[in-house]
């Protein structure tokens, strides 16, 4: 269906989503959204791309917005350990390109705080025969009988935090 998967993009971005508490303290957490959120999309993409080994990484991190605890929003991520004296010295945005031993490349972005429209999580895989996007629904892009095709697959939500646990609860 996909042929040789040679490129992938994955994002796990929050507009205002630092949970506070130990999550923002680098000595206790080890880092920000890359370690908290990004590892999951890296793991999933590596699995979907065939489990190849990384051979090089280029990355950049930013701490420009902080945890923005003073800003009110509809969605708020709060750790039970959050207090009025939280430290925030981790990145609020991380971006990287990972090259694998088969030549494929994965581009990732993970944020606790980013000036975007809304929180988003997307995974896209691009192969020599077709591509797929989980956003949160699953859409296949390819060709059929000489025509470019987009096929939206009728599945339960593929990449939704709430959707991930709905089946476990029901």
What are these regions (language model features)?
Residues 33, 37, 94-96, 104:
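Glycine/small-residue-rich pyrophosphate-binding loop that anchors the diphosphate of NDP-sugar donors
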Residues 51-53, 99-104:
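Secondary-structure transition into beta-strands, especially the periplasmic turns and strand N-termini
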Residues 109-117:
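Glycine-rich phosphate/pyrophosphate-binding beta-alpha loops
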Residues 2-6, 92, 102-106:
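Short, well-ordered coil/turn segments that N-cap beta-strands
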Residues 5-8, 57, 107-110, 134-135:
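Beta-strand scaffold of nucleotide-dependent catalytic cores
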Residues 1-86:
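Predominantly a Rossmann-like dinucleotide-binding segment in NAD(P)-dependent oxidoreductases
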Residues 18-20, 119-122:
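Adenylate-forming
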Residues 58, 62-90, 95, 99-102, ...:
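C-terminal glycine/acidic-rich active-site capping loop/insertion
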